[in-house]
Regions:
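Alpha/beta-hydrolase fold active-site loops
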Residues: 2-3, 33, 82
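Short active-site neighborhood of thiol/selenol oxidoreductases, capturing the structured segment around
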Residues: 1-13
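Structural microenvironment flanking redox-active thiols in thiol-disulfide oxidoreductases
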Residues: 16-55, 65-72
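Active-site-proximal beta-strand/loop segments in catalytic clefts of secreted hydrolases
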Residues: 7-8, 38-41, 63-64, 99-100
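Conserved hydrophobic/aromatic "anchor" residues
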Residues: 7-8, 49, 57-58
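Thiol/disulfide oxidoreductase modules built on the thioredoxin-like
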Residues: 52-57, 62-111
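Proteins that catalyze or organize thiol-disulfide redox chemistry
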Residues: 1-3, 23-27, 89-92, 104-116
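Hydrophobic beta-strand core positions in alpha/beta domains
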Residues: 4-6, 37, 85-86
Length: 116
């Protein structure tokens, strides 16, 4: 199944704005796709964010600033956040996006069936 990897941080305003939309999309897609957040942040900051923002129930991994290096390996040349990668069902990179997401475009892509 397709996988969405979203690199984000609690200190990144566009990242914070799109988290509820990603959570809603994860619930909507259910088992048809996986959404994972990788935080360029520390555990305490992420925990505080999730306590203040109910409903963020997709997996969130903490990588600290190593997340920025990892995102560069996935094609984030400038190292900015948010950065999102979509993998198809075979694990190949299908799409990369720097900056705030167009959640409707992401939804359409994931529901199109082209990634399975």
């Amino acid at each position: 199944k397709p996988v969405v990897i979203n690199f984000w941080a609690t200190w990144c305003p566009p990242c914070i704005r799109e988290m509820p939309d990603l959570a809603n999309l994860a619930r909507e897609l259910g088992d048809d796709a996986t959404i994972i957040g990788i935080a360029a942040d520390s555990g305490p900051h992420v925990q505080k964010f999730t306590e203040k923002t109910p409903g963020i129930d997709f997996p969130l991994l903490m990588a600290g600033y190593k997340a920025l290096n990892l995102s560069k390996q996935w094609g984030n040349e400038k190292g900015g956040l948010p950065f999102t990668v979509v993998l198809d069902a075979q694990g190949q990179i299908h799409w990369r996006h720097s900056g705030a997401l167009d959640i409707e475009a992401l939804r359409s892509m994931l529901k199109s069936g082209d990634l399975h």
